[in-house]
């Protein structure tokens, strides 16, 4: 850049402002604008070169041109900031245009959750039994072999102990006993009975696990088991308690209940409990609903009690089974497929 004097420098400064305005206006994005800025305001920019050339002028001209160059710098910076703002606004407008909301589209409903039908049954069962004086037990889902089988009078060669029916865990407890996923909620009753003195009146609802899966069985399912032990409990008490429970749960006073002789290692005598509706889609059909019986003397001993003094009854029902009958569901697997269309109907 060559200068003849202050007049030529003044013309050059004015021309630089015009050039900067054109260059900035031509910049289509932030990167191009920064490149244009460097051409005028950078370390090697045109204004920097002019400032270095002031040394060739006399003091009066240096003062005059210095002021003019600083004024030009302010003008160029103002043009730069204005273009930056314009580019930023254009970018924002483009983004907003691409994110335009079509207000004519139907709105989305609130994604409010609901209580699972099996949990509804769980809560209802607890409420009914609490109302007649039963406590509610809790316990671990990973159990030892003794509490799950031996304490309940299951012999070592019982089929339920096989790996085809039980999920075993490759670990042992502190006493060296094999661990497994509990196959029923009876272990909670064992633990409760060994920690409490008679009379013992408790239900044990919870998750259980067995190697089984079809329309009416699941590898994980829910059970509720009941236990009442005292000095004067009879089979008649079992019939009265469970019949009243079913009639309350299904809200049907005309529901018919029968007890069929059966066998379970932990009760003697044992009975399957069937029920029959006298109205509705299941009218006239006998439906198996529970297993029950008088607690076996050996099980009473394993509770730490004297079977000559204490007697009691026990029962066990599948919560999924109760839920299926209450709501008319035919396939247990529907409860766990996560189909909101199916689950939502229980919360309407």
UniProtKB/Swiss-Prot annotation:
The keyword Transferase is assigned to this record: no
One annotated GO molecular function: ATP binding
Gene3D superfamilies linked: Bira Bifunctional Protein, Domain 2
Keyword Magnesium: yes
GO biological process: phenylalanyl-tRNA aminoacylation
List of residues binding Mg(2+): 268
Cofactor details (free text): Binds 2 magnesium ions per tetramer.
Top-level taxon of the source organism: Bacteria
CDD domains xref list: PheRS_alpha_core (cd00496)
Similarity remark: Belongs to the class-II aminoacyl-tRNA synthetase family. Phe-tRNA synthetase alpha subunit type 1 subfamily.
Protein's name in the database: Phenylalanine--tRNA ligase alpha subunit
Species in which this protein is naturally found: Bordetella pertussis (strain Tohama I / ATCC BAA-589 / NCTC 13251)
Origin organism lineage: Bacteria, Pseudomonadati, Pseudomonadota, Betaproteobacteria, Burkholderiales
Gene field: pheS
């Amino acid at each position: 850049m060559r200068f003849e004097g202050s007049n030529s420098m003044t013309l050059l400064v004015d021309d630089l402002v015009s050039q900067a305005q054109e260059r900035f206006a031509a910049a289509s994005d932030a990167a191009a604008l920064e490149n244009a800025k460097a051409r005028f305001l950078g370390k090697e920019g045109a204004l920097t070169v002019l400032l270095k050339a002031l040394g060739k002028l006399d003091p009066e001209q240096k003062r005059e041109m210095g002021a003019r160059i600083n004024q030009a710098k302010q003008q160029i910076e103002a043009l730069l900031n204005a273009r930056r703002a314009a580019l930023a606004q254009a970018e924002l407008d483009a983004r907003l245009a691409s994110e335009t909301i079509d207000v004519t589209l139907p709105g989305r409903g609130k994604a409010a959750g609901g209580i699972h039908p099996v949990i509804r049954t769980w809560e209802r069962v607890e409420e009914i039994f609490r109302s007649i004086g039963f406590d509610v037990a809790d316990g671990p889902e990973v159990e030892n072999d003794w509490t799950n089988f031996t304490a309940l009078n299951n012999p070592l060669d019982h089929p339920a102990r096989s790996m085809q029916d039980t999920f075993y865990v490759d670990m042992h407890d502190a006493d060296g006993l094999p661990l497994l996923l509990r196959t029923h909620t009876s272990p909670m009753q064992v633990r409760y009975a060994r920690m409490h003195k008679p009379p013992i009146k408790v239900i044990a609802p919870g998750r259980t696990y067995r190697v089984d899966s079809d329309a009416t069985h699941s590898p994980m399912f829910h059970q509720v088991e009941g236990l009442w032990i005292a000095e004067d409990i009879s089979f008649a008490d079992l019939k009265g308690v469970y019949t009243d429970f079913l009639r309350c749960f299904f809200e049907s006073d005309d529901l018919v209940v029968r007890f069929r002789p059966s066998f379970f290692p932990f009760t003697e005598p044992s009975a399957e409990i069937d029920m029959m509706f006298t109205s509705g889609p299941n009218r006239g059909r006998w439906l198996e609903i529970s297993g029950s019986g008088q607690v076996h003397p050996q099980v009473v001993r394993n509770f730490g009690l004297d079977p000559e003094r204490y007697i009691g009854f026990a029962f066990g029902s599948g919560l999924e089974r109760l839920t299926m009958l209450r709501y008319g569901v035919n396939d247990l697997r529907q409860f766990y497929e996560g189909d909101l269309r199916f689950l939502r109907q229980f919360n309407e």
